[in-house]
Amino acid sequence: MLECKNLSCARNNKVLFKNLNFKAEPKSKILITGPNGSGKTSLIRSLSGLLPPVSGNVRYCGKDIYDDPKSYIPSMVYIGHKNACKDSLTVSENIEFWARIRNTKELITAAAYCLELQPVFNIRYGELSAGWKRRVALARLLISNANIWLIDEPFCNLDSITCELILNLISIRSEQNGIVIITGHSSTEQLCDFKTIDIRDFNRPLV
């Protein structure tokens, strides 16, 4: 279980949200909504261990992730706005790089197949369209073999077919006792089975 307890985060000395609480059990799918600048990205970065909270804590299996990051990091994968790919490398070289880090080279073929990357596998990443770049970045979800997926606006720059593909992968991960947390501006019909957390409910200054 991933749990936030009385979580408050700030950016540039500005408090974004205060006393946020939720629990994500295995098989959870959670959508964090709110307008730009409301703190969605900061929350998901905090959940990933990249942004220590002002107060409160994030716990995974009962342990504070900031006290014990080495045991938490292998359990999760975070996909942010930046795709974390090298323009000078081909798609296959980027994926192989991630697989070496996670020691999951056996998952490369499956990731390429599931995300239908074969047409661009030998093309340099910097030559791809925005949609293909995002799709390649999302291959890290499968390469990581992680229980927790944290994705900032996963459907950005994707066409409807690719969005459906990603939704199917999210559902499969959830059904396999995974936890999936994503951000978006609002809920949609396709995300109706996600639990929604509106970050604006916690946009209050610390006192």
Regions found by a protein language model. Give the residues of each.
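Conserved ABC ATPase signature
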Residues: 97, 124-133
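Q-loop/switch helix immediately C-terminal to the Walker
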Residues: 82, 87-103
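Helix-to-loop junction immediately C-terminal to a conserved catalytic motif
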Residues: 48
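Hydrophobic anchor residue at the start of the ABC signature
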Residues: 138, 177
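Conserved ABC transporter NBD signature motif
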Residues: 53-67, 71-72
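Catalytic Walker B motif of ABC-type/P-loop ATPase nucleotide-binding domains
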Residues: 149-153
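Conserved ABC ATPase "signature" region
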Residues: 105-121
